[in-house]
Amino acid sequence: VMEFIDAAKLLQKRFIGKVKFILAGDCDKENLAGLGEEKLRSLLVDDYIEWIGYQAQMFPIYTDSDIVVLPSYREGLPKSLIEACAVGRPIVTTDVPGCRECVKSGYNGYLVPAKDSRALADAIGLLIEDDAKRKEFGRNSRLLAEEEFSIDKVVRQTFDIYQSIIRIS
């Protein structure tokens, strides 16, 4: 979360009044290293960085967004990035396992080093400024979702795993 807010603030002079950074999700009260709600609210910037909290339905958020950003230190396979691909959004995320499975840097988004707000800001800025690249990456995200995350492919891969286990036994 901090890298997202820091990146937005690094871009503030160039883009305030032109874009809005929207942060969705609850504060993790169990995570002692996480941001508390009060601290998070103190970091927001009116009409520029907004926190909308937990959203039961993310589809409207994705469809209203031009870019999806997920700075993470570690992930499984992020559902949020699969959903972003499915709705055809370009993605900026960190170069960590899980996120790498959803983003091919330079194809449907950018992978940046974890904990690097400057690199995150640079990648977001590139996509804000380049409408054609944003649209191209969005189309490519949708193609990636259809190719890699379709139910047919997932079922086929699961079946293949079971087949290989049966052969080994």
How should these model regions be labeled?
Residues 68-69, 84:
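A short hydrophobic beta-strand element within the catalytic core of glycosyltransferases
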Residues 90-93, 103:
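Short hydrophobic beta-strand element within catalytic cores of glycosyltransferases
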Residues 59, 66, 88:
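A short alpha->beta transition loop at the rim of the catalytic pocket in nucleotide-sugar-dependent
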Residues 119, 126, 133-148, 154-160:
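A short, well-ordered alpha-helix in the C-terminal region of glycosyltransferases
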Residues 105-106, 110-117, 126-131:
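Conserved acidic donor-binding segment of nucleotide-sugar-dependent glycosyltransferases
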Residues 54, 73:
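Aromatic "clamp/platform" in nucleotide-sugar-dependent glycosyltransferases that forms part
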Residues 25, 34-53:
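Nucleotide-activated donor-binding/catalytic signature segment of Leloir-type glycosyltransferases, i.e.
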Residues 1-10, 118-119:
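A conserved mid-protein helix/loop that constitutes part of the nucleotide-sugar donor-binding site
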